[in-house]
C-alpha cells in the first residue's frame, strides 16, 4: 500500500491559487499533496544576445528551493556561490518544455522569465513547477494581450507534467518523496492537452526496465496528466 | 497625506500565519500591508567552529528575496554567484538582534537557523523579518522544550522591529516602499517587549537630522513596536 | 538523404582505441564518425562523505570539452569559473547510468572517477561518453581484480548508449551535429547488453511526438545499441 | 580604568598625514592611537550605469584590511574569493555618509572612489575610515577645482565619525579594540561640522539599553566629533 | 644514469602529428617521450578591449591538463572554480613567447587563441606546449594566408622550448618528471631558430647556482632547441 | 638619458623602515625611488596539509596592490573575486626564492606567511617585495629565536632582488615604470649575499636577445644586488 493510502493510479490532491504574488505578471501557488511551489511569470522587453534581431521571443526558467522546504535544512545556493547540477537540470527542463508549446515569433522580442520556488518539497517538485509555470505563463500572456503588447495568442497547446515510477514492483502515479527515494524506476513525463509527448525522462534507479514497464508507466502518466489538464481548464 | 491614507503614527495591517511551512521547526508567514515574508527556524545539533566546546549555542539568520518579490524582477543571488552587500547587512542585523534576547548557554550546543524569504516586498522587509524571525524562533524553542532537548526557556524577552522616517518633512511610522524611497531620514528600530533598545540604525538620506528629529522618530517607533508586541502576545 | 549519405538506421563508423592514456587505470579513445572522446577511469580508495561506513563504493563522472572541439572555439569552463548547466546534466547522466550496471557493494569502499573529455564534437558526445566510460570502467575493474583489490566482478551487465531523433519527419539513428541541431524530436537511449532500458530522455524540440513516434525511435535505438555492444564484445 | 589610562570622554591621539600616496588625487594616513588607515580618493570621469544621463556624480567607497593589520593574521579577501559581510557593511556605510555632505550635481558626471585600507587595527577602523575618507575627498575636490574640472565646491559640510559605547557599565568615547570586544553597548556616530547627525548605529551587544543610555552616548560622541573636526580644520 | 637510459645531452623521442583536431584552424599532437599535448590555434576576428583600434592583433594562450594526465588523478580546474597559479603562470609564458616572434600588425585586428591541453604529463609540459603551440600557430597562419585573410606572413622567426636542469650534480637536457621533481636547479629556455633567447626562467630548487652552471645549462638548451627546430623544419 | 637622470648602473634611493607594522612578527616599509611596499612576516604554528608530519616548516607569500598604488585606480582583486595571473606569478616567485635560503627543517612545523602589499608602484614591485620580504622574515625569525620557539637559525644566506633590462638599446639597472614599459628586454634577478643565483627570469619584450646581452645584464644585476645587501647588512 502507498504511504498515504492512495491507489496506484491516483494523484495527490491538487490545489491551485492564482495571482498569489501581486507584483508578478502571472503567478500561482501550486500544491500537490505536501509539495508546494510558488511560480511567477515576468515579462521583460528584451531577448538574450543569441536571439538578437531574430524577431522572436524567449522563455527561460529558474528554479530554487527555500532552505527549509525539506525536512532537513538545505544550504542556500546563493550562500554556496554555485547553482548545483540538479537545479541546472531542472531549470533547463522547465524552460525547454514551456517553449515547446509557445510560438516564440508571436511573443515578439520579449523574454518571459518563469521562476519556480519550492516552499515545501515532498516529491514531484520539477513536474509541479512545469504545471505551475505553465499556469503563470498563461496569466502573463493574457495580461500582455489585454495591454496590447501581444496581438495574437502565442500559446499553442496546454501542458502538464507528472512523475510515475515503479515502487516495490508496482507502477505508480505521482510519487511522493518516500516513494521516490526507494523507486526502482523513476520517470518524469510532460504532455500536451492534445495528448502528445513533450518530454520523457526515465531512469532505472535500481534495475533496468523493459519496454512493457515503459508502456505501463506511460499509460499511468497519461491518465494523471489528463486529470491535471482538466483541473487547469476548470480554473475560474 | 500618506500613499495609503494612513495617519503618520499608524502601522499597516499586520497578518501572522504560524506553522506556514510544515517541515520547519518553527515558521510563520508575516504580512505588513503588502510586504510578505516567510520565516522559518531550523534547529541543528552543532555549533559553528568558533563556538566549539564553549557549552553554548548560536543563532544565525539568512535573508533572501524571491526574484519577483519586487515590481521589476531581480536577479537571483544564486545566479549571480554572490550574496550582495545589502543581503549581508540584513542577515547580520537579524541574527544579532535575535541573539540579544536569547540566553545562548541555555540553548546548549545547538544552532538555530532563521531563514527569512521575502515573497513580496513593499518596504520594511528587514524589520518584518526580525519580527517574523522572532516568532519562528519562539515556536522552534517551544518544540525543542516539548521534546526535552532544552530544559530551561532560553528566551529572555520578546522583540519586534519597525521602520520610521521623515518623509516630506513629517515623521512617519512604518514606511511603505513609496515612502522609503523618498525619505529624508530613514531609521530601523528594534526594541524589546520591556521597552529597551536592541538596535538603532538611522541614516540621513537627504539631509542631516537633529537630536529633536531623532527623539520624535524614537517615540513613533516605540508606539509601533508596542502595538506589534501586543499582536504577537495575542497569537493563539 | 542524410548529410553523410548514411541510411536512416545506420550508425557512423565506430573506432575504439583502448589504453589511450597510459597513466589511467582504464582508458579509451572512442570515435563515432567525427565525434571523438577520451574516457579514463581512475580508482580512488575512498568514498564521498554521504557513503561513509556503508561498505559500498561509488562511481562518478566528469565531462568536459576541449575549447576547440567545436567548429567555433568555446570558452573554457575553468576560465568562466563555472561548470555550465549542460555539463552538469551530462555528467550526472553518465555517472547514473554506469552505476546502474555495477554492484557497488562488490566494489568495496572505493570511488571510480570516469572522466570524459571531448576532443572533437559532431553530435552524440554524451552517448559516446557513456559507451566509452563503460569500456574504461571495465578496464579499471579488470586491473583492480588482477591486483587483488576487488575479488568479485562488480559489473552486472554491459551497457551502451546512442542518440536517435526525428529529422525532416524521418526517424534516424545516431544523429550527427547537423542533424541534431535541426531535429524535431531528439532522444538519448541507454540500454544494457541484455536489452533493457537504463535511461530514456526524449525531447520535443520542434513539435510534440506521439506514442507511435516513440516506439519507432526506441526500435532504432535498440538496433544501434545491439551493434555497439557487439563491437565492444569483439575488442581484443 | 581604561586600558590605556584615558578618561572616559577622552579621544586617543590623532595623527593625520596628508598626501601620503602621491599617485592618488587625494590621500591621507590617519591614525587614532594604534589604528592606522590609508585613505585615497580617485576621480573617474564616468558614473555607474544606474546614474547614466542624470547629470550628477557618485561617491563610492571600498574598505580592506591588510592581512597583518590584526594581532593574528587574517585571510586575504582576494584569496577567499569573497568580500565578507562586515566589509560590505562598512563600505556601504562609508559611501553613504560621504554622499550625505556632497552635492552630487555639482560634482558633474564623475565618480569619486574612496579606498580605505587599514594597515593596523585597534578598534574604530570604520569611523577612522569615514573621517580619513572625508579628508581625502576634500583634497581630491580641491585638485579637481584647481584643474577646472569642477567649478563650484560640491562639499556642503564637514563630517567626522567616532565610536562610543558602554563598557563595564560606563559610557566611554573612542573605544580601542580591547574595550570594543567587551562592550555592553556599541555605537558608531557620524556627524557634520554643523552638529547634526548623518548616521547613528547603536547595537546592544550584551544587554538592551535605555533612552537615557542613548542620550549619554550621543553627548560623548558629539564632544569627540567636535574635537576631530577642529583637528581637521587646523590641518595645513 | 638517467631513468630512461638517455645521455645527459639527449632529448626524448619527439613525435609530431599535425592536423590532429580537424575543427581547429591549426592543430598538433606533440609528444616528447611520455609527455603528450594537444595544441590548437583558433583565429577570432576581434581583439581584446585594450587593443581596440590599434590596427594590430593579439596572440593569447590557455593551458589545461586532463584530470588523468597525471599518475594520480587531479581535480579539474572547472570543478574547483579557479584557474590555479601554476596554470596562470604557464599560459602567460606561452602567450608571451609566441607573441615575441609574430609581427602583430601584419596579423590585423585578429586574436589567435592557442590552446594547449596536456593529455599525458611526464615533465616538460610547458615547453612542449610552446613548441606545439608554435606549430599550430604556423598552420593557422598558413590557412589564413591561403584564405586571403592575411596578406603578409606575420611570423618573423621559428621558436622552440626545452627544459634543462641540474640533477644529482649533473647538467641534463629535457628532464622527465622523475628528474624534474628532484632537480637541484631547473630551467626553461625558449629560443628562436636564429639562436637568440626569448625567455630564460631558471630557479634554484635546492641550492643557489653559479654563473658557470648557468652557462652549461644554456649550452645544453641551445643544443636541444636546435634539434627540435630541425624536426619542425622537416615536417612535410 | 634615464627619466630620473640616473646613470645606467645606478640604483634608485633605497629607504627601509623596519617594524612598520607593530602587530606583525616582522615588518618593513621598503622604498626604491617611488616604489613603496609594506612587507610583514607572520608565524603560524602549523603547516599546509602536504607537509603534514614531515617535521619541517614552510614559507609562503601573498602579494597585493592597493587600488590607488597606480596612477590610474585598479580594480581590487577581492572585488573581482579572482586573484589574477600576474599576482599568482609574483607570489609564487616570492615564496620560492625565500624558501631557497631557509633550512625548513630548522624552522620546525611552522608556516611563515610573507605579505607584500604595494602602496605605491613605480616599477620593480616584485623585486622590492622579495628584498623586503627577506628583511621581514629575518625579523620574525629573530623574534621566534628570542622567544625560544626556534633554537637554531634556519636562515642560510641573505638574499636580494633587482630588475635589469635593455631600454633604448642600453642595459640598465633598476628600471622605473616608465623604463619597464618600453624595455626591449626585461629581467628579474634574485641572488644570495654569497653571490649565487636563486632565480633568473628574462623575457624578450620587443626582440630576442643574445648571450652577450644576457651577460651584461647579469653583471649589472650583480652590482645592484651587492649594493642592496650592503644596505641590509648596515641596518641597525
Swiss-Prot record, chains A, B, C, D, E, F:
The cross-references to Gene3D superfamilies, in alphabetical order and at most eight, read: GHMP Kinase, N-terminal domain (3.30.230.70)
- Where along this sequence does the record place binding of phosphate? 86, 124-126
The entry lists its GO molecular-function terms as:
3'-5'-RNA exonuclease activity; RNA binding; tRNA binding; tRNA nucleotidyltransferase activity
Q: Which UniProt keywords apply?
A: Nucleotidyltransferase, RNA-binding, rRNA processing, Transferase, tRNA processing, tRNA-binding
Query: What's the short name of a Pfam family annotated to this entry?
Result: RNase_PH
From what superkingdom does this record's organism come? Bacteria
> EC number(s)?
2.7.7.56
**GO biological process terms, semicolon-separated:** rRNA catabolic process; rRNA processing; tRNA processing
Q: Which reaction does it catalyse?
A: tRNA(n+1) + phosphate = tRNA(n) + a ribonucleoside 5'-diphosphate
InterPro entries referenced in this protein's UniProt entry, alphabetically: ExoRNase_PH_dom1, ExoRNase_PH_dom2, ExoRNase_PH_dom2_sf, PNPase/RNase_PH_dom_sf, Ribosomal_Su5_D2-typ_SF, RNase_PH, RNase_PH_bac-type
Which NCBIfam families does the entry mention? RNasePH
Supply the HAMAP family for this chain: RNase_PH
What is the protein's quaternary organization?
A: Homohexameric ring arranged as a trimer of dimers.
Functionally, this protein is described as follows: Phosphorolytic 3'-5' exoribonuclease that plays an important role in tRNA 3'-end maturation. Removes nucleotide residues following the 3'-CCA terminus of tRNAs; can also add nucleotides to the ends of RNA molecules by using nucleoside diphosphates as substrates, but this may not be physiologically important. Probably plays a role in initiation of 16S rRNA degradation (leading to ribosome degradation) during starvation.
What does the sequence similarity comment in the record state about its family? Belongs to the RNase PH family.
The name under which this protein is listed is: Ribonuclease PH
Q: Which organism is it from?
A: Thermodesulfovibrio yellowstonii (strain ATCC 51303 / DSM 11347 / YP87)
Amino acid at each position: 500500500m502507498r504511504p498515504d493510502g492512495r491507489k496506484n493510479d491516483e494523484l495527490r490532491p491538487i490545489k491551485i491559487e492564482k495571482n498569489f504574488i501581486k507584483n508578478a505578471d502571472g503567478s500561482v501557488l501550486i500544491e500537490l499533496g505536501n509539495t508546494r511551489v510558488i511560480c511567477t511569470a515576468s515579462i521583460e522587453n528584451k531577448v538574450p544576445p543569441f536571439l538578437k534581431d531574430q524577431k522572436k521571443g524567449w522563455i527561460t526558467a529558474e528554479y530554487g528551493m527555500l532552505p527549509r522546504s525539506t525536512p532537513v535544512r538545505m544550504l542556500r545556493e546563493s550562500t554556496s556561490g554555485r547553482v548545483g547540477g540538479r537545479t541546472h537540470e531542472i531549470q533547463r527542463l522547465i524552460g525547454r518544455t514551456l517553449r515547446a508549446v509557445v510560438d516564440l515569433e508571436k511573443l515578439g522580442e520579449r523574454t518571459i522569465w518563469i521562476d519556480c520556488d519550492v516552499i515545501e518539497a515532498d516529491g514531484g517538485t520539477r513536474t509541479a513547477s512545469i504545471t505551475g509555470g505553465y499556469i503563470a505563463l498563461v496569466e502573463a500572456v493574457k495580461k500582455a494581450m489585454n495591454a496590447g503588447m501581444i496581438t495574437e495568442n502565442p500559446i499553442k497547446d496546454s501542458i502538464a507534467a507528472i512523475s510515475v515510477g515503479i515502487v516495490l514492483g508496482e507502477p505508480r502515479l505521482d510519487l511522493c518523496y518516500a516513494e521516490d527515494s526507494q523507486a526502482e524506476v523513476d520517470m518524469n513525463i510532460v504532455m500536451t492537452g492534445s495528448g502528445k509527448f513533450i518530454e520523457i525522462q526515465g531512469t532505472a534507479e535500481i534495475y533496468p526496465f523493459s519496454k512493457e514497464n515503459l508502456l505501463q508507466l506511460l499509460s499511468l502518466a497519461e491518465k494523471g496528466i489528463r486529470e491535471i489538464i482538466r483541473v487547469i481548464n476548470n480554473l475560474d
